[in-house]
Amino acid sequence: LGLGALAAELRADVDYVKAVGTLAKIYEQDGTELLHGDFYPGSWLRHLASDSFWVIDPEFCFMGPAEFDVGILVAHLVLGGKSLIRALEVFDLYSSLPQFEPELALRFAGVEIMRRVIGVAQLPLESDINKKSELIACSKKLILSSNHVF
């Protein structure tokens, strides 16, 4: 089972395709938060001498839902081998936004995982097909589950 077969399975999953389409519509709507738009580790810099942190490459910025950038962050924690439990720590940072929806952020994370494993923006992940299959299963769970339990 290769990446092509994994992609074909997702394309054949009507519920998955519909859910991703719904997320695309949310992504395309005007939102209230200024987003980075590509908030993954390749856009983060840490200057060790001053212990400062910078986010670079603002050319993708747009107004949208905060859950989008947070979902990208959570996806890259998962792609980096971290547990989804780390998402709870991230969500705590957004608890002051009353409209923030952790479930939506997790769904966006699911799309980003899929995009980085089998999409046009694949990461050079050092993992075998079994690990990539697990990541795709995680993507499906995040996108299709209505109530995520950690």
Indicate where each model-derived feature is located:
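Short amphipathic alpha-helical segments and their helix-coil junctions
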Residues: 51-57, 88-101, 148
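Hydrophobic HxD+1 residue recognition
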Residues: 39
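Charged, long alpha-helical assembly modules
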Residues: 28-31, 60-62, 77
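Active-site activation/catalytic loop segments of kinase-like enzymes and analogous catalytic loops
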Residues: 66-97, 110-127
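All-alpha amphipathic helical-bundle segments outside canonical DNA-binding/catalytic cores
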Residues: 99-109
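An alpha-helical support segment within catalytic cores of ATP-dependent transferases
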Residues: 1-36
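Regulatory N- and C-terminal appendages and interdomain linkers associated
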Residues: 8-12, 122-150
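Catalytic activation segment of kinase domains across protein kinase-like and atypical kinase folds
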Residues: 42-73
